[in-house]
């Protein structure tokens, strides 16, 4: 709570400094883990127009009870939650941490896909924290979403993400059509027996001897 007013003044200073120099920029505040709760509490303290977007990820709580408290336009408050291995997400009680961002009405939900992280692990326990630090890792869809928003854009669509993965060689035609592997990489056990004169391909009456 003590840090929230300081963060609000800092963000206001960034905006005031830019305005004084005639510099226009998209100011996106990103808050991770407990820092997202502090950020969430600071946004209502800021002067209107200080920030353009607010993104929470791996957040235990939004810092507010209602999205209107942020004073940001509709569609400019986001949350990202990896579905596995982040026990911090939504951990805090609403009374002190604010509403779980995933349940905050009116929020824009970003992809929580962190599987591209080199450190990604498949969570084996309900309280696993293994992927809590993976959101900003290179190669994740979460980091791509953040980059888009920071640049003044929107979250990555499924089509855009697939195209990007394809361009980087991470998605191939085999990934889209796994059944093709059967024909391109035949298993010896599945190799059909040699044809005989009375069992030629295409003969509906063919029988293997």
Feature annotation, model-predicted:
Residues 40-44:
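Short, hydrophobic alpha-helix immediately C-terminal to the catalytic nucleophile
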Residues 30-39:
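Gly/Ala-rich beta-loop-alpha elbow adjacent to hydrolase catalytic centers
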Residues 1-25, 45-209:
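Lipolytic serine-hydrolase domain surface
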């Amino acid at each position: 709570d003590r840090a929230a007013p300081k963060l609000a003044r800092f963000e206001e200073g960034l905006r005031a400094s830019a305005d004084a120099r005639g510099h226009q920029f998209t100011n996106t505040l990103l808050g991770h883990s407990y820092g997202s709760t502090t950020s969430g509490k600071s946004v209502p303290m800021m002067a209107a127009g200080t920030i353009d977007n607010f993104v929470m990820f791996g957040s235990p709580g939004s810092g507010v009870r209602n999205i209107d408290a942020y004073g940001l336009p509709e569609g400019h408050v986001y949350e990202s939650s990896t579905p596995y291995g982040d026990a911090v997400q939504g951990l805090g009680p609403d009374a002190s941490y604010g509403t779980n961002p995933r349940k905050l009405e009116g929020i824009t939900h970003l992809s929580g896909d962190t599987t591209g992280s080199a450190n990604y692990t498949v969570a084996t326990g309900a309280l696993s924290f293994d992927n809590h630090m993976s959101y900003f890792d290179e190669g994740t869809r979460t980091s791509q979403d953040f980059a888009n928003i920071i640049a003044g854009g929107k979250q990555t669509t499924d089509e855009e993400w697939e195209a990007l993965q394809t361009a980087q060689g991470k998605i191939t035609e085999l990934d889209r059509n796994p059944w093709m592997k059967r024909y391109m990489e035949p298993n010896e056990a599945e190799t059909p027996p040699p044809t005989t004169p009375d069992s030629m391909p295409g003969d509906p009456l063919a029988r293997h001897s």
